[in-house]
């Protein structure tokens, strides 16, 4: 009898542990479009690297990956954060046809991570929702999209920078983002000074404009990765303009920073050394 009771107690405790783990698991939904090719805007494979790293981290993540907006009406049930890595602009492949659902998830406190071209939507309702979701976005005739080498000489103390050292990365770093007024709720994470050569292009929706020239002339540092905490604790967001080149996922500091950002937007306590991961790309780390 005593032995039977002991076994029952062990079984009960074991089930409780597993139930607790399952209940506490954080659900991350990754959305991508077809992108461009294997080397640039490789959204599907980029998401796959991040999703696998989260699953393998043993931190209690449950992930789902979709190409395009999910047709399954239950895809977002219980979601803690949504990662969007896709082409953007007026025909944003994921947001523009789903603004109502996007707004509902913001209202529900779901976290959001937008990367590279995915940070661009048209000014108006879509832009306003991006400000609510993650505190900033690429606005035509305000922001620009040149290629340049960003030198992140220092990083702020923040859960997203846990285990991340200053680094240099060549990328298509859009800058001069449209942020919340007075940067309210926004914490710059990646900031750098673009070279003056990024101002050599003629004026256009993405290339140059009087606003960015004024900012550059004033010597203002440009924030190209940022965290956002919504008012009244109603969710978190993160945006970054990097991610053009697929090879950059081989860089530990970049990969760790994005994994940390996903975890943070999902409400996970980021480990002091960052979310662990092993690079899966068989390529040389870019200089």
Q: What annotation goes with each model-predicted range?
A:
Residues 25-26, 31, 52, 57, ...:
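Extracellular ligand-binding/catalytic regions of CAZymes and related secreted enzymes
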Residues 45, 49, 78, 97, ...:
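Extracytoplasmic/secreted proteins, especially bacterial periplasmic and envelope-associated proteins
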Residues 140, 144-233:
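Catalytic beta-strand/loop cores that center a nucleophilic Ser/Cys/Thr
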Residues 91-166:
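A glycine-rich, often tryptophan-bearing local segment used as a flexible ligand/cofactor-contacting loop or short
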Residues 27-31, 38-121:
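Helical hinge/lid and interdomain linker segments adjacent to catalytic or ligand-binding clefts
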Residues 1-10:
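Bacterial N-terminal signal peptides that target proteins for export
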Residues 36-41, 91-92, 196-200, 247-251:
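Short, solvent-exposed loop/turn elements at domain surfaces
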């Amino acid at each position: 009898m005593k032995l039977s009771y002991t076994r029952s107690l062990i079984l009960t405790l074991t089930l409780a542990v597993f139930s607790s783990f399952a209940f506490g698991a954080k659900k991350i939904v990754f959305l991508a479009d077809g992108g461009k090719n294997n080397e640039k805007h490789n959204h599907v494979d980029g998401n796959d690297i991040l999703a696998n790293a989260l699953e393998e981290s043993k931190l209690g993540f449950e992930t789902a990956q979709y190409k395009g907006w999910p047709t399954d009406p239950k895809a977002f049930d219980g979601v803690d954060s949504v990662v969007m890595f896709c082409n953007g602009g007026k025909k944003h492949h994921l947001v523009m046809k789903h603004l109502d659902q996007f707004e509902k998830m913001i209202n529900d406190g779901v976290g959001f991570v937008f990367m590279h071209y995915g940070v661009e939507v048209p000014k108006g309702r879509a832009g306003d929702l991006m400000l609510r979701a993650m505190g900033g976005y690429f606005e035509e005739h305000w922001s620009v999209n040149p290629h340049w080498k960003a030198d992140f000489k220092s990083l702020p103390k923040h859960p997203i920078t846990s285990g991340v050292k200053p680094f240099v990365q060549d990328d298509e770093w859009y800058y001069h983002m449209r942020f919340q007024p007075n940067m309210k709720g926004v914490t710059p994470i990646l900031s750098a000074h673009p070279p003056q050569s990024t101002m050599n292009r003629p004026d256009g929706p993405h290339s140059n404009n009087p606003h960015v020239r004024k900012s550059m002339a004033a010597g203002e540092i440009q924030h190209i990765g940022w965290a956002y905490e919504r008012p009244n604790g109603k969710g978190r967001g993160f945006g970054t303009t990097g991610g053009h080149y697929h090879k950059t996922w081989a860089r530990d500091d970049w990969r760790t920073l994005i994994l940390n950002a996903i975890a943070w937007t999902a409400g996970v306590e980021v480990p002091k050394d960052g979310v662990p991961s092993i690079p899966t790309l068989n390529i040389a780390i870019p200089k």
